[in-house]
Design a protein with these regions (language model features):
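Conserved S-adenosyl-L-methionine
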Residues: 36-91
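SAM-dependent nucleic-acid methyltransferase catalytic core
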Residues: 2-24, 29-34, 78-171
Length: 171
């Protein structure tokens, strides 16, 4: 009996400019076959659509954006604490709360777990999921009119599991 069960793919926990999520089916035939490579190396991880799609057994991921890389490290090492913070944000979600979180993020006085939670919240609730900073290095994307913010607990836990086998570097 052939049930043809497909494994559910892990979705990126962030939206990022240049993301490949929409193109994965088109690119599928171009990806290396599982087992045909020893290590996956991604120098510009962004949202990580290809990385999460391939779920490599061994990987090195990197990016120039330090906050992005720190968020990946937090998802890898502290997913439950991160989810707990994001659940609190879920309950407080509003334009005013978004602006408060954005100000705190820009003040650059947060510990790594709070900084990652702020980045994920801002990314999921800002206009078009953009990451943009001004000349002072401050995140300045406006609120995206999202009526609701929902934490993807299962997605973060699944991403954490894949990231456990991954070396994460800031370049």
């Amino acid at each position: 009996m052939n049930l043809n069960i497909q494994k559910k793919r892990v979705e990126p926990f962030l939206k990022w400019a240049g993301g490949k999520s929409q193109l994965l089916e088109q690119f599928k035939s171009l990806f290396p076959k599982e087992g045909s490579y020893r290590r996956y190396i991604e120098p510009f991880i962004g949202g990580g659509a290809v990385f999460f799609y391939l779920e490599p057994k061994e990987a090195i991921i990197s990016d120039l954006n330090k906050d992005l890389i720190e968020a990946y490290k937090i998802v890898k090492s502290h997913p439950k604490e991160l989810i707990s913070l994001l659940k609190k944000y879920e309950k407080q979600h509003s334009k005013e709360f978004y602006l408060k979180i954005r100000d705190e993020y820009n003040a650059n006085k947060l510990d790594k777990i709070n900084k990652a939670a702020h980045l994920i919240y801002l990314n999921k609730t800002c206009f078009n999921g953009l990451y943009r900073v001004n000349s002072k290095g401050e995140f300045n994307v406006p609120f995206g009119q999202h009526k609701k913010f929902t934490v993807n607990k299962e997605g973060i836990l699944a991403a954490s599991k894949i990231l456990k086998k991954t070396k994460i570097e800031h370049t």
